[in-house]
Amino acid sequence: MYIIDQKLKDEQGRNVLFRGCNLGGSSKNPVQGGLSSWKTVSFIGRPFPLEDAEAHLERLRRWGFSLIRFIITWEALEHAGPGVYDESYLAYLRKILTLIGEKGISVFIDPYQDVWSRWTGGDGAPAWTLEKLGMDVDRLDAVGAALTRERYAEFHRGSYPRMIWPTNYNRYGAATMFSLFFGGNTYAPETKIDGESAQDWLQERYLACMRHCYRRLKTCKAIIGWGVMNEPHPGFIGCTDLHGLENYMVAVGPMPGGFQAMIAASGHRVSAPVY
């Protein structure tokens, strides 16, 4: 399979049109382990246990699917600490991807994230990425720097509102991490991690993790492509006025502007507009 004029071609030069699906939503969260036990979580069994794989994959084949957008996360690969890769999880991935290939289904690997991490209201990056920048991952909800489903009831009345999770893109936790990941050298050049600029350090860790994953999975013949990052966000980058609300996907409930988010994250009370 190859590409000509932005079109996928098979060995005979015919256009290839895939029928695909995501696999799967459960892969964003560990099988076991909560927000506090992040070093020892396990993603083995996501998207499903090996013993159930045959039934699920045969069903997808019968339904006519020829491509799977296979979800992995940075946290699943490197949750224990920088450079500490979960080889057991990678071995599990190799087995699952081999079974997918045996069904004649192709795979596009999708390094997934929503609002940076589970500690900032979504999924994706490991907790240590925040801790390396001095954030207390157990206190982000308390100061409004994140709204997580796991800790919402501790600080708010009622249940976790539907579709409020995208508002985390504008809260301090996720907005700061994305700003530093993509623009730290420009906007915060004196912010360092282990003596290196925050942007360079974070990007090097992320890319090193993806390279390691690629090396472990490169013999899986079902893989035809590899994504970079699902739905990256600019954080505060591009905002014209940090007093207001910009770069937002959804405005629901109390929504702080950039400066308000920074003040609240420092432990001070602020009044935020409610949408």
Residue ranges and their predicted role:
Residues I3-I4, K95-T98, E102-F108, Q113-Y275:
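Active-site region of glycoside hydrolase catalytic domains
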Residues F65-L90:
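Aromatic-lined carbohydrate-binding/catalytic grooves of carbohydrate-active enzymes
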Residues G24-K28, W74-L77, Q113-W116, E231-P234:
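Solvent-exposed loop/turn segments at secondary-structure junctions
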Residues G33-G34, E78-P82, T240:
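Short acidic, glycine/proline-rich loop/turn micro-motifs
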Residues G20-G24, R69-T73, F108-Y112, G227-M229:
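A cross-family glycoside hydrolase active-site/sugar-binding cleft signature
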Residues A55-L60, Y89-I96, C209, C213:
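A general structural detector for well-ordered alpha-helical segments in enzyme core domains, enriched
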Residues M1-L67, T98, E102, S106, ...:
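N-terminal carbohydrate-binding accessory modules
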